[in-house]
C-alpha cells in the first residue's frame, strides 16, 4: 500500500496474512519460484504483510528483508519470526520511498496483489527502485490478480462480509472509474463502527509487461488458482 491509502483496513485483515494462509499460498508458489532461489541469496520481500513468505524464504537459507507499510502486519511478522527462531529483518516503511540500496539483492518478490494499491503513475517508481536494488541479472517475482476479473466482479456496487482479526468486516465495492482504471472500496468494521475508503487500481498482465519492459526482461507467467505470477530479470 502507498502512503496516501489508509493503513487501518490492512491491519484489520491481519488474520488473512498469518501463518496458515501463508503456508497454503507457499505450497502453490514455491514449485515455480525455487529455481530462482539459492542459499545465501539476499532477498527483499516488498509489501510483505505478516511475513509468512519472508520467514519461509529465510528458512530456505536466504537473507531476507520484509517491508510493509502497515504497522500491525509488521508487528505480527516480528512475533512470528521470534516464535520460529527466524532472523528475517522486518521494516515498517513505504516501499515507494524507503531507500532499498543499490545492487545489493539477488532476488525481489512482491506477492498478494499488492500492486493494486499503487497508482499507475507510481508503478514506474516502484519498478525503478526495484531495478536499482537488484544485482545485474537479478529476478523480480510479481504476483497479481488479473484486473479484468476484478472489474467484472466489482463493476456493480456490492457488499462482502469477511472475517477480520477481531470482528466481521463489511467490504463494499462502491464504483469503478474506467478513466482512472480504479475502483473505490469501503471497509467497515462492525465492532468499532469505523469506516475507511480506499482506491484499488486495475492491472492486467499486458499492462504490467509494457511498464516493466523498459528495464526488465519478461521471462514467464504462471497461472495460479486465482492469480498470476510473473518473473522478470533485470537487464
Where are each of the predicted segments found?
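Core SAM-dependent methyltransferase catalytic element
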Residues: 216, 223-235
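Short glycine-centered segments of the SAM/dcSAM-binding site in methyltransferase folds
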Residues: 42, 137-139
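A short glycine-rich, Lys/Arg-flanked "PGG" loop and its adjoining helix->strand segment in the class I
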Residues: 124-136
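A short acidic, Gly/Pro-enriched loop at the edge of an enzyme's catalytic core
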Residues: 100-108
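Conserved class I S-adenosyl-L-methionine
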Residues: 1-38, 40-49
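SAM-dependent methyltransferase
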Residues: 141-210
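Class I SAM-dependent methyltransferase SAM/SAH-binding core
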Residues: 52-97
Amino acid at each position: 500500500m502507498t502512503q496516501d491509502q489508509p493503513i487501518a483496513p490492512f491491519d484489520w485483515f491481519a488474520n488473512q496474512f498469518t501463518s496458515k494462509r501463508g503456508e497454503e499460498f507457499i505450497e502453490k508458489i514455491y514449485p515455480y519460484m525455487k529455481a530462482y532461489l539459492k542459499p545465501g541469496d539476499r532477498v527483499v520481500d516488498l509489501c510483505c504483510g505478516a511475513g509468512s513468505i519472508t520467514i519461509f524464504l529465510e528458512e530456505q537459507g536466504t537473507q531476507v528483508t520484509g517491508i510493509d507499510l502497515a504497522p500491525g502486519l509488521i508487528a505480527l511478522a516480528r512475533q512470528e519470526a521470534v516464535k520460529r527462531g527466524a532472523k528475517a529483518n522486518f521494516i515498517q516503511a513505504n516501499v515507494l520511498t524507503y531507500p532499498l540500496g543499490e545492487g545489493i539483492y539477488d532476488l525481489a518478490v512482491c506477492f498478494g496483489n499488492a500492486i493494486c494499491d499503487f497508482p499507475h503513475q507510481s508503478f514506474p517508481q516502484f519498478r525503478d527502485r526495484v531495478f536499482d536494488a537488484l544485482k545485474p541479472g537479478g529476478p523480480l517475482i510479481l504476483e497479481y490478480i488479473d484486473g479484468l476479473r476484478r472489474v467484472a466482479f466489482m463493476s456493480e456496487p456490492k457488499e462482502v462480509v469477511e472475517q477480520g482479526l477481531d470482528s466481521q468486516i463489511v467490504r463494499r465495492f462502491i464504483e469503478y472509474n474506467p478513466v482512472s482504471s480504479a475502483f473505490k472500496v469501503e471497509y467497515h468494521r462492525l465492532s468499532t463502527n469505523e469506516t475507511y475508503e480506499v482506491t484499488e487500481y486495475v492491472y492486467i498482465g499486458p499492462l504490467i509487461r509494457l511498464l516493466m519492459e523498459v528495464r526488465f526482461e519478461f521471462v514467464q507467467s504462471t497461472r495460479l488458482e486465482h492469480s498470476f505470477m510473473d518473473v522478470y530479470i533485470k537487464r
